[in-house]
């Protein structure tokens, strides 16, 4: 049986792979699985649904809400809000489950559905498998009359609750900091500028006018050059770029240099260690993090725990070890004491708070880490499963590792959300990394 769930929920081309019928059935199955172990039966199960502003979101929102209600779940639809806001609100409302409809940084025609359990936590693989199994065994025998769930549309205070939460978490006065924020015409188009302004920062917002069709279009964290240009143009102290669902954040210093997720983690880790907030002096990162992060943390006396790629695996390790900071090079930064998932807006606030407390520029803070040259090539493939077992790929990897020696590394892995295979090479020199990565990518493409 083909697994329906990827590393970040169910994704696909909206109305083709991800249809309203599929969304309805997902809602029904999730209702059965996620409400079966409830401790309290004093009220009906409750679900929170949010979405990003892409055009298919309204259609899928209505479908999954109907599926949940048809299985006796009351539904609160909070409208367009970031993924971390839905995780927070699931907990804040005391809901039994949360649903976010978004394809994150993917192009507008795609969409996705991800679930949160009670407390706003991402689902483990085992629970997702139970939902898929429940879909295969759905019947028409649903509740009737008064046992059907109610649907409350566009709950008015969801955004206000989330903004209040952010203000309570980051209390540092950000007055005197000028920030450009690119919201990717996505889910944070309103809340991110509002949160930064509420903290005292002077905000220049760009790509913050979603029209259902322009999400991630030449903007946001996947087009960081737009933020770089705007920071220089407006003479800002920094820039922050989010993706479509605002669970990630990349930064730009005053000179227009990119500060990626690894550098952001290094900045926050050092600051948290100074304030005795970095539990066990440990940072959780993935195998894709730059070798420079490991070297910098060693210098600072900070340990690194490595995980597979994907913020869900970072979250699992954070929870397992009770650590207080983790993330990915892509800009997913997780502060588990304050949010159950990556939160781009909270990350932005935390970066600016570190600047305000230290009196240092972002460039000065980022200098704690030297980024080694890294080349990443995304290779479209038809069957991700066969790549790593192909003899020619194994031979190419061995040759690349021999060429790089101890001054670099090679990592090949399938994308969890797209039909791509990622080829990553780090080396002492950029040209060497580019050359080795190009050779490997050509071999992968030919399989």
Swiss-Prot record:
Catalysed reactions, semicolon-separated: alpha-D-glucosamine 1-phosphate = D-glucosamine 6-phosphate
Q: Which residues carry this modification: Phosphoserine?
A: 104
Keywords attached to this Swiss-Prot or TrEMBL record, sorted alphabetically, are: Isomerase, Magnesium, Metal-binding, Phosphoprotein
Keyword Magnesium in record: yes
Q: Which GO terms describe its biological process?
A: carbohydrate metabolic process; peptidoglycan biosynthetic process; UDP-N-acetylglucosamine biosynthetic process
List residues binding Mg(2+): 104, 243, 245, 247
| GO MF annotations in UniProt | magnesium ion binding; phosphoglucosamine mutase activity; phosphomannomutase activity
> What EC number(s) is this enzyme filed under?
5.4.2.10
Which catalytic residues are annotated?
Answer: 104 (phosphoserine intermediate)
Which cofactor is essential here? Mg(2+)
List GO terms (cellular component aspect).
cytosol
Any note on cofactor binding? Binds 1 Mg(2+) ion per subunit.
Alphabetized InterPro entries for the sequence: A-D-PHexomutase_a/b/a-I, A-D-PHexomutase_a/b/a-I/II/III, A-D-PHexomutase_a/b/a-II, A-D-PHexomutase_a/b/a-III, A-D-PHexomutase_C, A-D-PHexomutase_C_sf, A-D-PHexomutase_CS, Alpha-D-phosphohexomutase_SF
Modified how: Activated by phosphorylation.
Q: Name one Pfam family in it.
A: PGM_PMM_IV
Keyword Phosphoprotein (UniProt): yes
The superkingdom listed in its UniProt entry is Bacteria
Q: What does this protein do?
A: Catalyzes the conversion of glucosamine-6-phosphate to glucosamine-1-phosphate.
The UniProt similarity line reads: Belongs to the phosphohexose mutase family.
Query: Could you tell me what this protein is called?
Result: Phosphoglucosamine mutase
The UniProt gene name for this protein comes to glmM
């Amino acid at each position: 049986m083909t697994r329906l769930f990827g590393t970040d929920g169910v994704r696909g081309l909206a109305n083709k792979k991800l249809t309203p019928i599929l969304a309805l059935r997902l809602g029904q199955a999730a209702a059965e699985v996620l409400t079966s172990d409830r401790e309290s039966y004093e009220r009906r199960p409750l679900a929170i649904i949010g979405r990003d502003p892409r055009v298919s979101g309204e259609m899928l929102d209505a479908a999954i809400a109907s599926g949940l209600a048809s299985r006796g779940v009351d539904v609160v639809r909070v409208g367009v809000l970031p993924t971390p806001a839905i995780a927070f609100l699931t907990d804040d409302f005391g809901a039994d489950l949360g649903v976010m409809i978004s394809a994150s940084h993917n192009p507008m025609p795609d969409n996705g559905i991800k679930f949160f359990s009670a407390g706003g936590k991402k689902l483990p693989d085992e629970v997702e498998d139970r939902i898929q199994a429940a879909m295969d065994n759905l019947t028409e025998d649903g509740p009737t009359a008064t046992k059907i769930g109610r649907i409350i549309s566009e709950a008015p205070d969801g955004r206000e609750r989330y903004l209040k939460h952010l203000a309570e978490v980051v209390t540092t006065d950000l007055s005197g900091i000028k920030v450009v924020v690119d919201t990717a015409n996505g889910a944070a188009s309103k809340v991110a500028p509002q949160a930064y302004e509420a903290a005292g920062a002077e905000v220049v917002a760009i790509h913050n006018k979603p029209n259902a069709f322009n999400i991630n279009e030449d903007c946001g964290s996947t087009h960081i050059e737009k933020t770089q240009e705007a920071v220089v143009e407006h003479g800002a102290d920094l820039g922050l770029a989010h993706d479509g669902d605002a669970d990630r954040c990349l930064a730009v210093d005053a000179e227009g240099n990119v500060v990626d997720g690894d550098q952001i983690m290094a900045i926050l880790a050092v600051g948290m260690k100074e304030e005795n907030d970095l539990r066990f002096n440990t940072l959780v990162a993935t195998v894709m993090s730059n070798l420079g992060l490991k070297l910098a943390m060693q210098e600072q006396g900070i340990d690194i725990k490595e995980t597979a790629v994907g913020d869900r695996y970072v979250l699992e390790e954070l929870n397992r070890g009770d650590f207080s900071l983790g993330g990915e090079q892509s800009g997913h930064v997780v502060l588990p004491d304050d949010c159950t998932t990556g939160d781009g807006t909270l990350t932005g606030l935390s970066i600016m708070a570190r600047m305000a407390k230290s009196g240092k520029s972002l460039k000065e803070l980022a200098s704690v880490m030297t980024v080694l040259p890294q080349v990443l090539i995304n290779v479209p493939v038809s069957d991700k499963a066969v790549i790593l077992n192909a003899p020619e790929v194994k031979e190419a990897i061995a040759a690349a590792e021999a060429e790089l020696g101890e001054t670099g590394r090679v990592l090949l892995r399938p994308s969890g959300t797209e039909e791509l295979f990622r080829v990553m090479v780090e080396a002492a020199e950029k040209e060497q990394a580019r050359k080795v990565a190009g050779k490997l990518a050509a071999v992968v493409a030919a399989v």
